[in-house]
């Protein structure tokens, strides 16, 4: 079973993906981490983030063991990843990695921005997570401060709005809700509420298969 979760930055899709994977005993892949890993490798090399050839080479040589590096969660890496992920050739280079992950039994939960539309268009369940930008900025600010980072909520909001615009309008796999996706607005839901709502969606889908 493949569960695809998409949504904009800081919408809560990553946390939801982890919880759903644990609930069902499936593997979980935060596909945003893949692009963050490419971005970090590019920065470590001192390379131009828009250097397509270098970025593709880095993408093809990714080491999954490094996906847990806490540095990947920082705002700076997130901003860099937004640039790298807009390169069509980079996205193409990473498609097979994601599809192979999704195909491994007994099931997988993948979260990102193009899972239900590009990576796994035939996913058994598709959930598109949304939340008010101000709510997302507040959550992201609290996360950053929890890691000991200085974070200005107004600047975080501005960055989120900028990333939304970039993600929606990029030429390669723009952020959009699949026609057969279930929209989950968690603006007024805590983590537990969001998980319960998602499980209800999944169980309903399983019952009608």
UniProtKB/Swiss-Prot annotation:
One of its GO terms (biological process) is pyrimidine nucleotide metabolic process. Pfam families: Cytidylate_kin (PF02224). It comes from the Bacteria. It catalyses: CMP + ATP = CDP + ADP; dCMP + ATP = dCDP + ADP. Its EC number is 2.7.4.25. The keyword Transferase applies. Gene3D superfamilies: P-loop containing nucleotide triphosphate hydrolases (3.40.50.300). GO terms for molecular function: ATP binding; CMP kinase activity; dCMP kinase activity. GO terms for cellular component: cytoplasm. ATP binds at residues 7-15. The keyword Chloroplast does not apply. SUPFAM superfamilies: P-loop containing nucleoside triphosphate hydrolases. It is found in: Cytoplasm. Keywords: ATP-binding, Cytoplasm, Kinase, Nucleotide-binding, Transferase. InterPro entries: Cytidylate_kin, Cytidylate_kinase_dom, P-loop_NTPase. Belongs to the cytidylate kinase family. Type 1 subfamily. This is Cytidylate kinase. It comes from Afipia carboxidovorans (strain ATCC 49405 / DSM 1227 / KCTC 32145 / OM5) (Oligotropha carboxidovorans).
């Amino acid at each position: 079973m493949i569960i695809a979760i998409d949504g904009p930055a800081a919408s809560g899709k990553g946390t939801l993906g982890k919880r759903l994977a644990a609930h069902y005993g499936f593997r979980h892949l935060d596909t945003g981490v893949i692009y963050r890993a490419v971005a970090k490798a590019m920065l470590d090399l001192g390379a131009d983030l828009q250097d397509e050839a270098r970025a593709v080479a880095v993408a093809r040589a990714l080491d999954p063991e490094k996906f847990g590096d806490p540095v990947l969660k920082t705002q700076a890496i997130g901003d860099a990843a937004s640039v790298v992920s807009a390169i069509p050739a980079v996205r193409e280079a990473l498609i097979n990695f994601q599809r192979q992950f999704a195909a491994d039994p007994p099931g997988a939960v993948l979260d990102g921005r193009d899972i239900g539309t590009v990576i796994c268009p035939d996913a058994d369940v598709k959930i598109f997570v949304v939340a008010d930008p101000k709510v997302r900025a507040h959550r992201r600010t609290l996360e950053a401060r929890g890691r000991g980072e200085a974070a200005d909520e107004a600047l975080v909001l501005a960055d989120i709005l900028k990333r939304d615009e970039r993600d929606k309008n990029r030429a390669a796999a723009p952020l959009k809700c699949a026609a057969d996706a279930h929209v989950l607005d968690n603006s007024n839901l805590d983590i537990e509420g969001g998980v319960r709502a998602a499980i209800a969606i999944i169980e309903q889908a399983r019952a009608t298969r």
